[in-house]
Amino acid sequence: MRNPAKQEDLIKAFKALLKEEKFSSQGEIVLALQEEGFENINQSKVSRMLTKFGAVRTRNAKMEMVYCLPAELGVPTTSSPLKNLVLDVDYNDSVVVINTSPGAAQLIARLLDSLGKAEGILGSIAGDDTIFTTPARGFTVKQLHEAILRLFEQEL
């Protein structure tokens, strides 16, 4: 049976390491955790933890691709701190453009795509900090823009 205190220590250490923004591979994270006393850690466990905590790869200040946590996130919901990662929402005649904090665009796009056509979203394309979203049939770009603003409680 797992020791809950040990598991909690592992999670704290894992999050602290990712906040350093210097690990470019899962293997490097495994080695760092082993150095901190977590002997039974392996690459598959690190991979599951990266997924569970919504870690993304982004460029650090040295322009290196590293793993980081965009925010304290579990499963993305519109009431979670995820909305704090949305910096701006604008639109033109074709698409709604959403600007996010670096590394957060794919997570936000995943949430939008999960809402789907019923909410007016045909699909999204995400880069590192920008998302293009297009409206589903029967919705205007302006309606989609307003729906996204409401979703993330932004000002109109």
From Swiss-Prot:
Keywords: Amino-acid biosynthesis, Arginine biosynthesis, Cytoplasm, DNA-binding, Repressor, Transcription, Transcription regulation
InterPro entries, per database record: Arg_repress, Arg_repress_C, Arg_repress_C_sf, Arg_repress_DNA-bd, WH-like_DNA-bd_sf, WH_DNA-bd_sf
Cellular compartment(s): Cytoplasm
Keyword Transmembrane: no
GO molecular function: arginine binding; cis-regulatory region sequence-specific DNA binding; DNA-binding transcription factor activity
Primary localization class, coarse: cytoplasm
GO biological process: L-arginine biosynthetic process; protein complex oligomerization; regulation of arginine biosynthetic process; regulation of arginine metabolic process
Pathway participation: Amino-acid biosynthesis; L-arginine biosynthesis [regulation]
Pfam family, one: Arg_repressor_C
Cellular component per GO, a single term: transcription regulator complex
Stated family: Belongs to the ArgR family.
HAMAP family linked to this entry: Arg_repressor (MF_00173)
Function statement: Regulates arginine biosynthesis genes.
The name this protein goes by in its record: Arginine repressor
Species of the source: Yersinia pestis
Gene assigned in the entry: argR
